[in-house]
From Swiss-Prot:
This is Peroxisomal acyl-coenzyme A oxidase 2. The gene is Acox2. Its main location: other. Homodimer. The modification Phosphoserine is found at S3, S9. The lineage of its organism: Eukaryota, Metazoa, Chordata, Craniata, Vertebrata.
Length: 681
């Protein structure tokens, strides 16, 4: 287990004595927490390096996070900018490479409280969509911060539907320039991070027109502000969109372009280019221009979305062994609230989700890296599957992490409503992920189209090997399975093959039913597009089931690989069982629909689920400790490693500046009101 010095880093005078209620949870562990941390990090060397980086960050006063809860929005923005450029100087002095693990670990401990994250997204787009010459030019400028960029895709009137983007890029062959223009109010770029006050350039997504022919969405590098005094350039209207639900430190912005001219060479041209005479040449597929967004989406899973749920689990679980409420028996002292089955039922499934998603993200990352280099070489055979997997997992991660973080917040009662708990910030960030980089429902429906296409491909040659093999992730839909679950007892439902088969069966049935319903409507004369729209609710249900099956399968396979770590394998197997069964019980109607499960079998699954709760509860603190987020990173009065919740809440509240300042409302309103009533009396 990591040392208390590593984990406790807030400098409070009581931090070196761990509260006995949480200390007892760590006695006689059933597995090595340190070894599990190494597994989650991808090996001991990674853990060592991560902690070294975190120690450097946490010892630097510029990176302090404790004052964030008391700052204004403008102060939060300036603080986040200061942190980013201090980090760049530090990285340069220590020789950290742009894409090295040190950067990832530094951002992990800073918990997203640095700005210019869209600078990295824009660099991803340049590396993915730019030619070698463009990468050499623009990539170096970005790397050296000679320019600061953002990725400007979303518009006031369009988001996830990229074909509907209205911003225009018209090629002027006489001057060999591209004219970038916002023709309508709704074509205003809206939401790009860092655009409001910070960036000098933007990778702008716009509809390309050459010689009067429209060629769809492409990416263009457009200067936004002067490199001399940071004022907007001619034809540019730019600013901040105003207050938001969360992410107050980020200057999300708007951008209007009034016939702004850029050189022809500013169009990113790995997969398409415009020749000087206006001839358009496509070097890839129409979907190639989504590659930059796909890269960002894969990175978001582990670095941007999942940590919110992991941290929420740590905070809520630690608080739940410190908080005592009511009695299990009249003669007993008040019990830790984690002893109550209802609290376990809230929190432990979220812990299971955190682990399931970690191993799923690892699997997807491996698939991404194995296919990305091929795509850059214009081999697009794996692009549809990679798009479907990344899209489905982004939607699934965002949905479950937002819901789970909120469940954790509510599980902490009133204290979870305090920003000092850290939970409202985590909930707001997870909630934002449900709409940025694609609105989740739209993303699920993109997965559904892929599933329907794959299902029809499988049905074209039933019982035979199809001419074109099915993508690996959907091969299960062509497999014949029993129409009834084989489980006879509650214990049977803790067999991975039983619940994995159950999820594969239900997912396949829902995909089949959605495809058949769409085809039936089309055969009855309904237009193809209308038929799709009239069945999207069914397709959405199928896509969600497919995504859940993928996560169950990935978790199961990850646990199976831990056969040389029997203690860890045992505890993770319980979490895997809980994750799969929680999904079955939450969606029991889908399993009962055609009799795959009987009512009695659902009762057995519930019994198995409830039996798992006390087993996992014994290891709950250790399982959250294994995520190895330091107190600095959690920045939570409720979730510190030492368990001194109430002392920390009280001390942090004393630091609120308003508590030591004169209250202007007293003289202006309260005192006159009180005096007025006294005179009337």
């Amino acid at each position: 287990m990591g040392s208390p010095m590593h984990r406790v880093s807030l400098g409070d005078h009581w931090s070196w004595q761990v509260h006995p209620d949480i200390d007892s949870e760590r006695h006689s562990p059933s597995f090595s927490v340190e070894r599990l941390t190494n597994i989650l990090d991808g090996g001991l060397p990674n853990t060592v390096l991560r902690r070294k980086v975190e120690s450097i960050i946490q010892s630097d006063p510029v990176f302090n996070l404790k004052k964030l809860y008391f700052m204004t929005r403008e102060e939060l923005y300036e603080d986040a900018i200061q942190k980013r450029f201090h980090l760049e100087k530090l990285a340069w002095s220590l020789g950290w490479s742009e894409d090295g693990p040190e950067r990832i670990y530094a951002n992990r401990v800073l918990d997203g409280n640095v700005n210019l994250s869209l600078h990295g997204v824009a660099m991803n787009a340049i590396r993915s969509l730019g030619s070698d010459e463009q990468i050499a030019k623009w990539g170096q400028l970005c790397k050296n911060f000679q320019i600061i960029t953002t990725y400007a895709q979303t518009e006031l009137g369009h988001g996830t539907y990229l074909q509907g983007l209205e911003t225009e890029a018209t090629y002027d062959e006489a001057r060999q320039e591209l004219v970038i223009h916002s023709p309508t109010m709704t074509s205003t770029k809206w939401w790009p991070g860092d655009l409001g006050w910070s960036v000098t350039h933007a990778v702008v997504l716009a509809q390309l027109t050459c010689l009067g022919v429209r060629h769809g969405m492409h990416a263009f590098i457009v200067p936004i502000r002067s490199l001399e005094d940071h004022t907007p350039l001619p034809g540019i209207t730019v600013g901040d969109i105003g207050p938001k639900m969360g992410l107050e430190h980020i200057d999300n912005g708007f951008l209007q372009l009034n016939h702004v001219r850029v050189p022809r060479e500013n169009m990113l041209s790995r997969f398409a280019e415009v020749l000087p005479d206006g001839t358009y040449q496509r070097l890839g597929t129409p979907q190639s221009n989504y590659l930059g967004m796909l890269v960002t989406r894969v990175q978001l899973l582990c670095k941007g979305i999942l940590p919110s749920l992991q941290k929420a689990c740590i905070i809520a679980t630690r608080y739940s062994v410190i908080r005592h409420q009511s009695r299990l028996r009249p003669s007993d002292p008040e019990a830790k609230i984690l002893e109550y089955q209802t609290q376990q039922q809230k929190l432990l499934p979220q812990l299971a989700v955190s682990y399931a998603f970690h191993f799923t993200a690892t699997s997807l990352s491996e698939f991404f890296h194995s296919s990305y280099s091929a795509i850059l070489k214009r081999d697009f055979s794996l692009l549809p599957e990679l798009h479907a997997l990344s899209t489905g997992m982004k939607a699934t991660f965002a949905d479950f992490c937002a819901q789970g973080a909120e469940i954790c917040r509510r599980a902490c009662g009133g204290h979870g409503y305090s920003k000092l708990s850290g939970l409202p910030t985590l909930v707001a960030r997870a909630t934002a992920s449900c709409t940025y980089e694609g609105e989740n429902t739209v993303l699920y429906l993109q997965v559904a189209r892929f599933l329907m296409k794959s299902y029809l491909q499988a049905q074209a040659s039933p019982g035979a090997t199809p001419q074109k093999p099915l993508p690996q992730s959907v091969m299960y839909i062509a497999t014949q399975r029993p129409a009834r679950c084989s489980a006879q007892t509650a214990a049977d439902f803790r067999c991975p093959d039983v619940y994995t088969t159950a999820w594969a069966y239900v997912s396949t049935r829902l995909i089949r039913d959605a495809a058949h319903r769409t085809q039936t409507l089309m055969k009855s004369g309904v237009d193809q597009h209308d038929a799709w729209n009239q069945t999207t609710v069914i397709h959405l249900q199928a896509a969600k089931a497919h995504c859940y099956f993928i996560t169950v399968k990935n978790f199961k396979e990850a646990v199976e690989k831990l056969d040389k770590e029997p203690e860890i394998q045992r505890v993770l197997q319980r979490l895997c069982d809980l994750y799969a069964l929680h999904g079955v019980l939450t969606n029991s109607g889908d399993f009962l629909h055609d009799g795959f499960l009987s009512g009695a079998q659902v009762d057995m699954a519930r019994e198995a689920f409830l039996d798992l709760l006390p087993l996992i509860r014994k290891d709950a603190i250790l399982l959250t400790d294994a995520f190895d987020f330091s107190d600095h990173c959690l920045n939570s009065a409720l979730g510190c490693y030492d368990g001194h919740v109430y002392e920390r809440l009280f001390e942090w509240a004393q630091k609120y500046p308003a508590n030591t300042q004169e209250n202007p409302a007293y003289k202006k309103y309260i005192r006159p009101l009180m005096l007025g009533w006294r005179h009337k009396m």
